[in-house]
Amino acid sequence: MTDTAAVRGLDAQGYIAREGSLARVPAVFRPVVAAARERLTDLFGVRLHSAYLYGSIPRGTARVGRSDLDLLAALHDEPAEADHAGARALVEALDAEFPQIEGGGALLYGRARLLSDLERHDMGFFVACLCTPLLGHDLAASLPRYRPDTLLARETNGDLGLLLPRWRERVARAGDAGDVSDSEHTRRSLVRYMSRHLVRTAFTLVMPRWNGWSSDLRVMADVFAGYYPERAAQVRAAAALGYEPTGDAAVLTAYLDDLGPWLAREYTRVHGTKAARPEDATAS
């Protein structure tokens, strides 16, 4: 592997290298990971095909009391709503028990969907390159290797235009909350989520030209800035808020009225629109 390829998250052949490993999990987070492994097994039993960690914990960059626990579980069959509810309860229990983490989430998919043609360059890529095996047989063995090309860009983040109306609804609901402290907390969560999503979308917009991969928000923002200097300050500010969010409603307004719509238009112009998913037809 060349030094340049390593810095840009690629292997010697120019494919995106898998990030994260259990060996990189900081010692303080290992009890959380062990508990997650045990409880996922208890929750899903023989229905569980495999489970994965992703995010800062397996990358070794998690911050005590600030980072969340991110899990993905692949079931042999398609998950039902009760399964999603059970996974949410599992993460909430871990969050309450372990002060090392601040929140988290668990994605649930059926094995067949993760290996499908439709998901090959979205969730398939996510599992193969951004997830660290925790339990079961690693699905990456059944998935291709990935280059940072326009197909990957389109299928990972080419749906921002579809997401923006849903984000507006979430922000409106946060504004309608009766309890001021609850509203502040909700806005802070939305700022964190939207900031990260917009920075990642800005990065994958230019990813094929840069020819590399990173999951570091600041690196992503800096890479984007090299191609769109007129938007650099906005995306760098979003990267900072992705790590240290506030509950400022003005930030959300700027995302929804300016940066988000511009980025969605430019993304569609450059890469096209992500292939429709079945749930898109029924999503509100």
Model-based region annotation:
Residues D3-V28, V32, R88-S189:
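Conserved NTP/Mg2+-binding pocket subregion across the NTase superfamily
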Residues M1-S50, R231, V235, A283-S284:
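Helical scaffold of the NTase/Pol beta-like nucleotidyltransferase catalytic core
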